[in-house]
Amino acid sequence: MEKLRVGLVFGGCSGEHEVSITSAKAVCGALQTAPNPDKYEVIPFYIHKNGCWQAGEVANQVLEMGKPQDQAEEGSRWHFPEAAASIDVWFPILHGPNGEDGTIQGLLQLMQVPYVGSGVLGSAAGMDKIAMKTVFAAAGLPQVKYESVTREQVWSDPCVFKQVCDRIDETIGYPNFVKPANLGSSVGISKVRSRLELEAALDSAASFDRRIVVEAGVVAREVECAVLGNGRPRASVVGEISFDSDFYDYETKYTEGRASLQIPAPLPADITEKIQEMAINAFIAVDAAGLSRVDFFYVESTGEVLINEINTLPGFTSTSMYPMLWSVSGVDFPKLVDRLIQLAVEYHAPAD
């Protein structure tokens, strides 16, 4: 049987460039673990921080070293690697803006070649927290109270900014969390306990994104569920995250030992089933495909399960929950990567 040529795309222009490299290195290792080498040939494509694409020796060196390369010459930005023409299926491992927001998905869609993960709509809805919450509300999925804010409201007029803060005081209260709407890995998030902190947090978030979401704080356990599939997705076991910091921030996520993970989570059976059902419903609501990780708050005092967010292109690092959840569910890493590629081929197959 002829091997499928898998284009592994990683790096990118976002602040999660290094995380992308780490994830891609893990995926590449899984594709080189039996029986996958008999089925796939991996062709890595590295996107520099300035947007230049490179394949071949440079991309292989980045994977081998696990760290970014010096920026390519600006003149090479518009020269797409010739190796792209021979790819049978793309595997984008790009996190943050331009990677999981529908941008790269649109490019791959234009190539008319299958690719792993959600399409343009699912990726965009899963990236923008305001759009995501709007979809969740329409699907009847319970979530914490929130307010949306724009950069213009924060920076353009002091009177408008005061009105925004007054509204948040009244509808959300404290503590709350201020988040850029379109960044992942907890980049740019602030926990806010007072009006003064709110003003500073909004100003900070506006420097990251033109759209901002403010969410009510809640005393709850943080749990996650992985989803795998296309039209008939299935949910993994549920995992729980515990940490000593104020919230699950970037450093805690990607530093081993900073967070405690328990898989499966010690939850009542009915709560576990509810989380799994809600995870699948969220996956369908945003029109996701292939894979997603869905995060929840479990309010133990009331028995409520509140959806937090969906991540349509979760990490594949050694501390990433998505592959760990599936491993405990009986799908090891090489088998998971193999399944994701097969799902991509199935999803993009021409309709009969």
Curated annotation (Swiss-Prot):
Looking at the UniProt record for this protein, which Gene Ontology cellular component terms does it annotate, in alphabetical order?
cytosol
Q: Does the keyword Cell wall biogenesis/degradation apply?
A: yes
Q: What is this protein called?
A: D-alanine--D-alanine ligase
State where the protein is found.
Answer: Cytoplasm
Give residues annotated as binding ATP.
Answer: 169-224
The residues the record assigns to binding Mg(2+) 2 are E309, N311
Q: Which cofactor does it need?
A: Mg(2+); Mn(2+)
Name the pathway it acts in: Cell wall biogenesis; peptidoglycan biosynthesis
Q: Known catalysed reaction(s)?
A: 2 D-alanine + ATP = D-alanyl-D-alanine + ADP + phosphate + H(+)
**What keywords appear on the UniProt entry?**
ATP-binding, Cell shape, Cell wall biogenesis/degradation, Cytoplasm, Ligase, Magnesium, Manganese, Metal-binding, Nucleotide-binding, Peptidoglycan synthesis
The cofactor note reads: Binds 2 magnesium or manganese ions per subunit.
Function comment: Cell wall formation.
> Principal localization?
cytoplasm
Q: Taxonomically, which superkingdom?
A: Bacteria
Q: Which Gene3D superfamilies match?
A: 3.40.50.20, ATP-grasp fold, A domain, ATP-grasp fold, B domain
Q: Which residues form the ATP-grasp domain?
A: 133-342
Keyword Manganese in record = yes
A molecular function annotated in GO for this UniProt entry is: D-alanine-D-alanine ligase activity
> Which organism encodes this protein?
Acaryochloris marina (strain MBIC 11017)
Family membership noted in the UniProt record: Belongs to the D-alanine--D-alanine ligase family.
A Pfam family that this protein carries is: Dala_Dala_lig_N
Q: What EC number is given for this enzyme?
A: 6.3.2.4
**SUPFAM superfamilies recorded:** Glutathione synthetase ATP-binding domain-like (SSF56059), PreATP-grasp domain (SSF52440)
Binding-site residues, Mg(2+) 1: D295, E309
Q: What class of enzyme is it?
A: ligase
